Amino acid sequence: KLSRTGHTSWTLEEIDFEDGPYQDENITDTTLTPSHTTGSSRTITASAVTGINGGHGFQTTDVGRLISIGHQAAAWAASTSYSVGAVVRNSGNVYECIKAGTSAGSGGPSGEGDEIVDNNCTWKFLRDGGIQWGYAKVTGRTSTTEVTVTVNETFGGTSAETKWRLGAFSETTGFPAAVAFYEQRLFFAGTTEQPQTLFGSKSGDYENHTPGTLDDDPVIYTLA
């Protein structure tokens, strides 16, 4: 991206996309298993190559690509101490603790919002569905079924999961050939693998492609 911070001050740098955009969620039986929930020089291991790059598995061109894996979030618990960053599921939704404290004796967070009070805890609605999605960036390829990664958003566990999705932009899939601003979103389109798909950012947050269900969340649309 090209940034202008002064009359004669210009900077050209690579965009660091936040959590996406992604291709469609996996529908095969192939699982991905992260070795750790956080950190760098971690590994993600696939149970098979099915569903990964057209059945060819991980490629060296996947370096720099994002991988997102979903685990069931921990259930909210009554009268429990939570620290900032803790993620729980309650009432069919997923919430992140943004103010540490002790949860209420019953009920817990519900609905959508950025500051949901739960006794002296405060929660932020993340998404519906009860799944905690973490994501990592590929830093190396060991084989067609294993890559090394840096975890950017904490995974919900280290179990093998079929809920995963691969980044839409990479040397493997191609990068967008077209870009435009529209209604406070930054849209990208024209990748080699998905030439008819539009990827729109979160409203007013041009590098944020975190999947969600709110009105201002990122959008993906494929022309028929």
PLM regions with names:
Residues L2-R4, S9-A104, T122-S159:
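Autoprocessing Asn-cyclization modules and mimics
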Residues E25, R42, S47, D114-E115, ...:
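Residue-level marker of intrinsically disordered, low-complexity segments enriched
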Residues I98, P109-G111, F199:
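A generic "cationic amphipathic patch" detector
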Residues E161-R185, A189-A224:
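Beta-propeller and closely related beta-pinwheel folds
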Residues G105-V117, C121:
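Short, tandemly repeated low-complexity microdomains enriched for cysteine and small residues
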Residues K1-L2, V179:
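Broad, structure-driven detector of short, well-ordered beta-strand segments within folded domains
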Residues E18, N26-T28, T33, G111-G113, ...:
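Generic preference for flexible, low-structure residues
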